């Protein structure tokens, strides 16, 4: 019998890393809805090649092209033959998750909540629908404090466990060097509207002495390139194994999102020793302490972010980098794993 039957969207690298660690302590079986997605930052974002646990992939292809009814039938077959103590679904956004919530016993049903109070409606019809889903859930594994705020707003009465993360990043070895401020800022992620990159481009257009490098692809890329000055560099998608080199080339990481359920790239930036400027709408903003390892800003306030950027110098950067270096990512990951035990 499995301790957990986990059902999640795709085999993203950070989920594979988390499940591999869980599999050292627990017996788990993972159902991946699809093998890949068209919405990702790099070509090697998802793969089951490194999986060290039992799993099944329902659809071999992009998540957006999957056959939902066929997936539900496959889930029905798996549930009839696999014995488990708990079943953990990774959201309430898919028909597959709703099928599981209403066909499995409530006492076994768990939810991994990666939505925050900022991007998920809790009032009106949408809030009512979420409450119906939660009525079938006994335990919620909430990523952080903004996720717990959403549960409170939805009046969830079940058990809540806080994971302080959504997965485990890759941790390649690298040589740490002391940085001198060179005015180089970095963004890594999808180039879509909710990431608020037009806001960032307009700021750096007005600050030609600073450089912004944007890594990723998305529907806004062509438009943003057309309005960007020469101090804004678009690099396209870069494989995960080369991400460390990009952090090394830059001084500060920026995540300006209007909506960001977590923001795993913030953990990557801290791991590689970069301070982080982060929107207060991001779930992982709780990892950043103002003036210690970065700064938190309002993603609609250009003047405030411009002031933060202009204030950077060698001394401020080195102090922030020193604190970013001292961030214990392994301790955070150990705590995340322990929540499931």
PLM region spans:
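Conserved acidic donor-binding segment of nucleotide-sugar-dependent glycosyltransferases
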Residues: 290-291, 295-302, 309-315
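Conserved donor-binding/catalytic core segment of Leloir-type glycosyltransferases
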Residues: 177-195, 201-207, 212
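Donor nucleotide-sugar binding/catalytic pocket of nucleotide-sugar-dependent glycosyltransferases
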Residues: 135-175, 180
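Nucleotide-activated donor-binding/catalytic signature segment of Leloir-type glycosyltransferases, i.e.
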Residues: 222-241
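Short hydrophobic beta-strand element within catalytic cores of glycosyltransferases
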Residues: 275-278
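Aromatic "clamp/platform" in nucleotide-sugar-dependent glycosyltransferases that forms part
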Residues: 258
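A short, histidine- and acid-enriched strand-loop-helix "catalytic/donor-clamping" loop
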Residues: 95, 109-125, 136-139
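A charged, aromatic-enriched C-terminal amphipathic alpha-helix characteristic of glycosyltransferases
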Residues: 316-341
């Amino acid at each position: 019998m499995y301790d957990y039957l986990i059902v999640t969207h795709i085999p993203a690298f950070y989920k594979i890393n988390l499940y591999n660690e869980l599999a050292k302590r627990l017996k788990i079986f993972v159902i991946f809805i699809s093998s890949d997605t068209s919405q990702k930052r790099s070509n090697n974002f998802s793969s089951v090649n490194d999986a060290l646990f039992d799993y099944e992939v329902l659809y071999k292809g992009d998540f957006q092209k999957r056959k939902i009814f066929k997936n539900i039938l496959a889930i029905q077959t798996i549930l009839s033959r696999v014995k488990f103590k708990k079943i953990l679904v990774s959201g309430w956004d898919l028909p597959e998750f709703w099928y599981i919530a209403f066909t499995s016993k409530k006492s076994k049903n768990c939810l991994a909540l990666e939505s925050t109070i900022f991007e998920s409606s809790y009032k009106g019809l949408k809030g009512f629908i979420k409450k119906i889903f939660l009525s079938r859930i006994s335990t919620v594994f909430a990523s952080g404090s903004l996720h717990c705020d959403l549960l409170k707003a939805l009046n969830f009465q079940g058990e809540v466990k806080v994971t302080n993360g959504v997965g485990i990043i890759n941790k390649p070895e690298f040589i740490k060097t002391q940085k001198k401020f060179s005015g180089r800022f970095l963004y890594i992620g999808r180039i879509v509207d909710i990431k608020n990159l037009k806001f960032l481009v307009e700021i750096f257009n007005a600050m030609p002495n600073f450089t912004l490098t944007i890594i990723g692809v998305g529907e806004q890329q062509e438009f943003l390139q057309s309005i960007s000055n020469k101090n804004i560099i678009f690099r396209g998608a870069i494989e995960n194994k080369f991400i460390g080199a990009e952090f090394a080339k830059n001084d500060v990481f920026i995540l300006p999102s209007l909506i960001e359920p977590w923001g795993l790239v913030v953990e990557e930036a801290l791991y590689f020793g970069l301070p982080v400027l982060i929107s207060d709408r991001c779930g992982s903003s709780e990892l950043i302490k103002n003036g210690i390892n970065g700064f938190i800003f309002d993603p609609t306030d250009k003047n405030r972010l411009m002031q933060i950027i202009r204030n950077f110098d060698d001394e401020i950067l080195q102090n922030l980098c020193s604190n970013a270096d001292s961030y214990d990512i392994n301790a955070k990951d150990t705590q995340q794993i322990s929540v499931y035990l």
